[in-house]
Amino acid sequence: LKEFFRTKTKITRSAIIASLVVVAIFGVLQAMESKSATTDQVNLTVDVASVIDVTCPDPSAFGTLTPGTAVTTTATCTTTTNNSTGYILQAKRDDADTTLDLSTDATTNITDKTAWDSTANTGDGNAATWSGTGLGFRVMQTGTDSGYSSTWWGSDDTLTNAKFAGLPSAYDTILDVSSAGETDAAVGFRLDVPAAQTAGTYTGTATFQVTANP
């Protein structure tokens, strides 16, 4: 009987030891398994640059002007930008004194209307309805997709309500667009001269510039 209990005790101890070994191995395997898959994150950032571009194809020529009978033409500037706050369109003449000079004598000019000043009259600008002679321009309501200012350029495009100004000698803002995308701005020119204006071909250029809004 004693021998029986000795044998049983040995078997029990062996079983306990075996169980402990199995538990230990299982614990190691669990630990190994829990460490076999782990995660971490990486942060990806990129700054997309603001891009902006403007194209202003040449307008059609004024043609032949008879003094006292005004002529008009229109240039359309197309601006493309991804800047979420949009852009400003600015314009200037490229001649120091007047926009249009006689091609054979640069000292003979066509008078410009009073140069546009967007800051005049507490920001209302200084464009005025048409009268008399000279070269004037304005942003047109028709053909301008966004940003048209009736305060600056008149309530509509009719001659009674449309406001004109002369091209400035330095860049000045003529349109403010507040969103991204592709937009057109129609810029109208109107010209008349007095009867005493020297006959001949007059030429000149205006430059448009777009700048992304902050």
Predicted regions mapped to residue ranges:
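Signature of Gram-negative chaperone-usher
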Residues: 30-214
